[in-house]
Amino acid sequence: MALPEFSMRQLLEAGVHFGHQSHRWNPKMAEYIFGARNNIHIIDLAQTVPLLHRALQAVSDTVAKGGRVLFVGTKRQAQDGVAEAAKRSAQYFVNSRWLGGTLTNWKTISGSIKRLRHLDEVLNSGDANAYTKKERLTLQRERDKLDRSLGGIKDMGGLPDLIFVIDTNKEDIAIQEAQRLNIPVAAIVDTNCDPKGITYLVPGNDDAGRAITLYCDLIARAVIDGISRAQGDSGFDIGASVAPVREELPAAAAPTATAFQGLAGPRGTADDLKKLTGVSGAIEKKFNDLGIFHFWQLAELDRDTAHKIGEEVGLPSRADGWVAQAKAMTAEAE
């Protein structure tokens, strides 16, 4: 893998150069403004290109060192792109309302995450039948409310090592919390925003859907590059062992029927699946019980199958991330 490439043409086509109306500008952004056209400020992409590359490098370096990246974008245009990019790169996100203290009061937030996990267990188990229909509805509403705010960080396990922000004006509380904890901030900064305190500033349009999609895609790919580098730095050589011939398990050895029937996985020298984010020895054994012994097996899974496997091993929210990591590692081997 390598750091994602992009061109100025891509930025132009996505509308990254369009700022806000000239009367809405923040004078602190003057050095990043090329000029004005029809009372709209035009961002200087000659500066955006190297600054965006710098931000991508910072993201990749953070992940390569084992760090976590938190995507933050709660405005309507950013919600879907932020969530998709974070899931695709096995990272974390906040795309609904930012709860004050999400970073600075992590202990309290952790308590709410535990409550969310408990509600998930209750509502997805036979214990739910012990409640009346009205009680189940109340629990479901509480669970949905918590999931909107915390679903993207419930597996984070601690503070992030870097946050990526769309719209610094709207996410000012998140940025203040990160600054207070000395957490680096990479952010898209429009002409109406204050660049002060942003570690990795990227001048650009923070409203256009195409621009936001481009930013999120590039950051996600930078994360995957970091994951790939981390695997290489750990001395793990994906190409060191040749993938064995795939064999079907004898019928007698087939695993007991469950919600997911398991794969007819090959045997031979197994990959160390514990290199995947959040996979312990116990989870690795569950993978093996389902017939999964190699990264290429995960890389070839479709989304539905991956989620079924995630449910079987008890970490459904990790499924997309595992597939992304596995694809990165198999691509490195090729």
UniProtKB/Swiss-Prot annotation:
The keyword Ribonucleoprotein applies. GO terms for cellular component: cytosolic small ribosomal subunit. The keyword Protein biosynthesis does not apply. One of its GO terms (biological process) is translation. It comes from the Bacteria. GO terms for molecular function: structural constituent of ribosome. Keywords: Ribonucleoprotein, Ribosomal protein. SUPFAM superfamilies: Ribosomal protein S2. InterPro entries: Ribosomal_uS2, Ribosomal_uS2_bac/mit/plastid, Ribosomal_uS2_CS, Ribosomal_uS2_flav_dom_sf. Belongs to the universal ribosomal protein uS2 family. This is Small ribosomal subunit protein uS2.
